[in-house]
C-alpha cells in the first residue's frame, strides 16, 4: 500500500487527542510504535486491550478466498479499535489492521476504558462523533460498492475519499491527501488494477480528475454534476 497521511487532516485530530478528553486515557495505557506496513492486529486475534490510534493511519482489511485484499476502512488519529471487541460484540478481531504510515498506538485495559467512558461525558461525546463520522463514511463506501459499472464505482469512491481526506486547492480542485496507487483504489471497490487504471484514465479524459504519480485531484463540482448527487458536495467526515 502507498498511502501517505495528509498533515492538515491529522493535525486537527491529533490536537483533539492531546488536548481533548482522549488524554484521560493515556495515563491508563502503554503506547507502542508500529512501523509502516507492520500488522497492528491480525484477523481472528484476541486483542489484549482497547487500542487507540494516537498518530498515523491504519488500514482495516480482509482477504478473499482468492487471496485478494479488500479494504474495509481507514483509521486516523483518535480512532478506537477493534470496535467489535471493545463493545463486546466479538471476542476476536474481524479484520486485519495494518499501519499505512508509522503509527503510535495506545493500548489500555478494556475495564479501564469502559470505566473512563462511563465517567467522562466529554470523552463519550467525542467517541460518538467519531463513530458517526465512520458510519457516514461506511454508507458512502457501501454505496460505491453497490454500483454495477466500474466507472460508477470509482466516481463514488472518489466522492468518499474527497469527503474523508479532501483538501481544497487554490485552483479550485480538491486534493485527496493520501498517496494512492491504482491497486489501492481497486482494493476499495473490488476491481482489478487493470480495470481501475483504464477507468481512471477515462475520468481524467473527462476532466473529472487529474493525477500525477500517486496524487489525485478531483473537480468536485463536475463530479457532483456527473452523479447528480449534490447532497454529497459538502460532506466532510
Residue locations for each model-derived region?
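Cyclic nucleotide-binding regulatory module and flanking cytosolic helices
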Residues: 1-36, 80, 85-88
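Cyclic-nucleotide recognition modules
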Residues: 21-22, 73-136
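Short loop/turn motifs at secondary-structure junctions and domain boundaries
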Residues: 23-24, 41-44, 170
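Phosphate-/nucleic-acid-contacting segments
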Residues: 163-237
Amino acid at each position: 500500500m502507498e498511502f501517505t497521511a495528509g498533515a492538515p487532516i491529522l493535525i486537527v485530530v491529533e490536537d483533539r487527542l492531546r488536548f481533548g478528553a482522549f488524554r484521560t486515557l493515556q495515563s491508563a495505557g502503554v503506547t507502542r510504535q508500529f512501523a509502516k506496513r507492520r500488522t497492528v492486529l491480525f484477523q481472528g486475534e484476541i486483542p489484549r486491550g482497547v487500542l487507540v490510534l494516537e498518530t498515523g493511519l491504519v488500514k482495516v482489511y480482509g482477504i478473499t478466498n482468492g487471496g485478494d485484499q479488500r479494504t474495509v476502512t481507514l483509521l486516523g488519529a483518535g480512532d478506537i479499535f477493534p470496535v467489535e471487541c471493545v463493545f463486546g460484540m466479538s471476542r476476536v478481531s474481524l479484520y486485519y489492521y495494518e499501519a499505512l504510515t508509522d503509527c503510535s498506538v495506545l493500548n489500555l485495559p478494556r475495564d479501564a476504558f469502559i470505566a473512563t467512558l462511563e465517567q467522562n461525558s466529554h470523552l463519550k461525546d467525542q467517541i460518538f462523533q467519531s463513530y458517526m463520522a465512520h458510519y457516514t463514511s461506511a454508507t458512502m463506501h457501501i454505496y460505491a460498492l453497490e454500483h454495477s459499472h466500474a466507472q460508477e464505482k470509482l466516481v463514488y469512491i472518489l466522492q468518499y475519499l474527497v469527503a474523508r481526506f479532501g483538501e481544497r486547492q487554490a485552483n479550485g480542485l480538491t486534493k485527496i491527501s493520501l498517496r494512492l496507487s491504482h491497486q489501492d483504489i481497486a482494493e476499495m471497490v473490488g476491481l482489478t488494477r487493470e480495470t481501475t487504471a483504464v477507468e481512471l484514465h477515462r475520468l481524467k479524459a473527462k476532466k473529472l480528475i487529474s493525477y500525477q504519480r500517486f496524487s489525485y485531484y478531483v473537480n468536485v463540482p463536475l463530479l457532483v454534476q456527473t452523479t447528480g448527487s449534490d447532497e454529497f458536495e459538502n460532506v466532510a467526515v
